[in-house]
Amino acid sequence: KGELSQYVNPLITVTISDNEVVVSRSSDEKQERAFHGLYRALINNMVVGVSEGYKAELELVGVGYRVSNTGNVMELALGFTHPIFMVLPAEIKVETKTERNKNPLITLESCDKQLLGAVCAKIRSFRKPEPYKGKGVKFVGEVIRRKSGKSAGAK
């Protein structure tokens, strides 16, 4: 599905043997243990990403919230006086779906989990879900903690 590369700190050694990637460290110092776990997870994410790929779905909840894309340029209408145009990196494939009486969906696919998460966070940051009505850009399946709002008759 693609090709990924990663810088590795000199304290950590990465070797490939018998179709297996082995991450090892020279000592048990705290920083080396931390780097060991970090690079093991990053390499695992890269292997899974290149073999299977990653997918993220965002949902636009709110009246008049729309999304459309032409190639890798996404146009978001999120209740502002202007549309938001976002140019996505070439490694990310985007698909938008708008059905009648359903919230618009944005489906992002990539082999790079880190980049995919950063782009999703950027899109979500344009209009985060608010706790009173739940309007905004949220991940599919994300539960928004709701608040009751003004308490009626509380004196």
Regions found by a protein language model. Give the residues of each.
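N-terminal intrinsically disordered, cationic/polar leader segments
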Residues: 1-36, 40-48, 52-121, 125-155
